[in-house]
């Protein structure tokens, strides 16, 4: 895999501080939440994969926010359906 430099990823995000926040958030999604990577993973750790995704333009703060909203909406919808089913049974 090609090496990822912070400078390449900073250009996509704007500054180092926001880069750290976005990369950490995406790395958590990959490592803990089991999200699918937009680049080949190989033997790279989630932080490196997150930086590569940012560098290639697949991940930004706004895409993470939009994905989070979609996930939250799906979770809310499932909870509403569960409550509706319980109420119908009564």
Swiss-Prot record:
Pfam families, sorted: RNA_pol_Rpb6 (PF01192)
The name this protein goes by in its record: DNA-directed RNA polymerase subunit omega
Gene Ontology molecular-function annotations: DNA binding; DNA-directed RNA polymerase activity
Enzymatic reactions: RNA(n) + a ribonucleoside 5'-triphosphate = RNA(n+1) + diphosphate
SUPFAM superfamilies: RPB6/omega subunit-like
Disulfide bonds: none
Enzyme class: transferase
Top-level taxon in the UniProt lineage: Bacteria
Single Gene Ontology BP annotation: DNA-templated transcription
Function noted in UniProt: Promotes RNA polymerase assembly. Latches the N- and C-terminal regions of the beta' subunit thereby facilitating its interaction with the beta and alpha subunits.
Originating gene: rpoZ
EC number: 2.7.7.6
PANTHER family: DNA-DIRECTED RNA POLYMERASE SUBUNIT OMEGA
Record InterPro entries: DNA-dir_RNA_pol_omega (IPR003716), Pol_omega/Rpo6/RPB6 (IPR006110), RPB6/omega-like_sf (IPR036161)
Keyword field: DNA-directed RNA polymerase, Nucleotidyltransferase, Transcription, Transferase
GO cellular-component term (any): DNA-directed RNA polymerase complex
Record flagged with keyword Transcription: yes
Subunit structure: The RNAP catalytic core consists of 2 alpha, 1 beta, 1 beta' and 1 omega subunit. When a sigma factor is associated with the core the holoenzyme is formed, which can initiate transcription.
């Amino acid at each position: 895999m090609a090496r990822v430099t912070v400078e390449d990823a900073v250009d996509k995000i704007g500054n180092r501080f926001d880069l750290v926040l976005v990369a950490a958030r995406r790395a958590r999604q990959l490592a803990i939440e089991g999200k699918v990577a937009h680049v080949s993973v190989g033997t790279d750790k989630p932080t490196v994969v997150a930086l590569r995704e940012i560098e290639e333009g697949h991940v930004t703060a706004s895409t993470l926010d939009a994905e989070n909203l979609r996930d939250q909406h799906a979770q809310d919808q499932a909870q509403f359906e569960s409550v509706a089913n319980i109420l119908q049974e009564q």
